[in-house]
């Protein structure tokens, strides 16, 4: 489905998203993508099938330039062919990135680094984008900009899975939400409906 799916996590968010992306082996269950069981496939094969991950804390190569970090996202053959086009699209989504292409990524602010991390994932031409805590450690104004871009990415046809502890933000932009606690799904459903459940409002929204 071409949806934004929000996952509000109280524990084990990294294990969840890493298992989906093939970075951790599953101890049970399966991951199905496009009707195919892809459990425990290596990340490079999942990337070629249309998945891309924006990891928590960005994980940029800080000694490399912004351009070099972005181009690392376009490693599989289909993405390499469209590398210049994809780079231009990233710069359209994040105008500040265009001005920093020749700068070492380690000199950027946290918000700018997050832009580069999202841009790097988009360079892989994903059909589904997995984001792990994209708002972590960012100023409120930057968070607002980041979520607007995530909405734009979705509107252009990319499905999004968002692991996020900022519950109000996640509910606002997602169509479906899963609430995890200690590795178990304790609530799921339409995001608008979940946002109006008294127990969710009390436990996660402070209302």
Regions found by a protein language model. Name each.
Residues 1-10:
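Single conserved hydrophobic/aromatic residue that forms the stacking wall/gate
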Residues 11-207:
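Glycine-rich phosphate-binding loops of nucleotide-dependent enzymes
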């Amino acid at each position: 489905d071409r949806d934004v799916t929000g996952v509000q996590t109280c524990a084990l968010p990294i294990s969840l998203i890493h298992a989906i992306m093939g970075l951790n082996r599953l101890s049970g269950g399966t991951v199905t993508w496009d009707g195919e069981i892809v459990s425990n496939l290596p990340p490079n094969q999942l990337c070629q099938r249309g998945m891309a991950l924006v990891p928590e804390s960005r994980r940029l190569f800080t000694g490399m330039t912004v351009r070099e970090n972005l181009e690392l996202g376009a490693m599989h053959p289909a993405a390499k062919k469209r590398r210049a086009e994809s780079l231009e699209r990233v710069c359209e989504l994040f105008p500040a990135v265009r001005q920093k292409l020749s700068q070492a990524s380690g000199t950027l602010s946290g918000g700018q680094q997050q832009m580069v991390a999202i841009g790097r994932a988009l360079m892989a031409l994903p059909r589904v984008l997995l984001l792990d805590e994209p708002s972590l450690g960012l100023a409120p104004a930057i968070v607002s900009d980041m979520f607007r871009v995530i909405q734009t990415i979705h509107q252009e046809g990319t499905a999004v899975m968002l692991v996020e502890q900022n519950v109000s933000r996640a509910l606002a932009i997602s169509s479906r939400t899963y609430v995890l606690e200690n590795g178990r799904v304790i609530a799921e459903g339409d995001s608008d409906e979940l946002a109006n459940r008294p127990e969710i409002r009390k436990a996660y929204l402070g209302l």
